[in-house]
């Protein structure tokens, strides 16, 4: 399965490196089917939309899966984020 959650570094055009967790997949919990790359950055509040960015996948965390609902997904994301933070620190 190529859809996965990965610990990742994101670099912007100013070469600033940010830590996060990336999901490449189709968001099955939300009944979507088009591929998308989403990156959740840790402790980051600035607007970087329409910026040139590079995502470096560091380590596989788990395959993407469908959850019973948003609350189950949020619970799993907390665990995923904790794993990614350990990997990236």
Model-derived regions: residue spans:
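Phosphate/ribose-recognition catalytic cores of enzymes acting on nucleotide-derived substrates
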Residues: 1-89
